[in-house]
Regions:
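Short, well-ordered alpha-helical segments
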Residues: 30, 74-85
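Preference for long, well-ordered alpha-helical segments
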Residues: 103-124
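Amphipathic, charged alpha-helical scaffolds that flank and support histidine-based chemistry
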Residues: 92-108
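Short, well-structured hydrophobic secondary-structure segments
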Residues: 32-52
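Solenoid-repeat scaffolds in large eukaryotic assemblies
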Residues: 49, 56, 104-107
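Generic structural signal for well-ordered, non-transmembrane alpha-helical segments
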Residues: 54-57, 61, 86, 112, ...
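Short, solvent-exposed, charged loop/turn and helix-capping segments
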Residues: 62-78
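Short, small-residue-biased leader/transition segments that mark boundaries at the very start
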Residues: 1-3
Length: 124
């Protein structure tokens, strides 16, 4: 499958996905970008590491921007999630600055925890 076929397939998945699935896809993308950044860092490819962490930060910012506290049953929980996403983005900025794999791992673990909870509330 060539690159253009993958893009078409990705666009089809996004256009057909439920809002819940779109959030899952963003989280999966964030985790993938962080894994790619770690791989680039281990190879000494600092430019690629920066690019992948930048994309992970954009994804986390997108998740944060998608929060709707006014529609939540528990607005305080949304505020805590907002603060967590903010923390995650800041940690990735710092991880990028100092080339720290442990910081990337920390954010990956946090995002996995959030994703596990999100996956558990999937609509039936």
């Amino acid at each position: 499958m060539c690159s253009s076929d993958l893009k078409v397939n990705s666009h089809a998945q996004v256009s057909e996905a439920s809002p819940h699935r779109l959030v899952q896809m963003l989280m999966e993308g964030g985790l993938d970008r962080m894994a790619q950044a770690k791989g680039a860092l281990s190879r000494g490819d600092i430019a690629q590491k920066g690019l992948m962490l930048g994309k992970a930060i954009e994804i986390i910012s997108g998740l944060r921007d998608g929060l709707e506290p006014e529609k939540a049953e528990d607005p305080a929980a949304i505020q805590r999630l907002d603060a967590l996403y903010n923390y995650m983005g800041n940690r990735l900025v710092e991880a990028n600055r100092v080339n720290d794999v442990e910081m990337i791992d920390e954010v990956s673990r946090l995002l996995i925890t959030v994703k596990t909870g999100w996956d558990a509330i999937a609509p039936q």
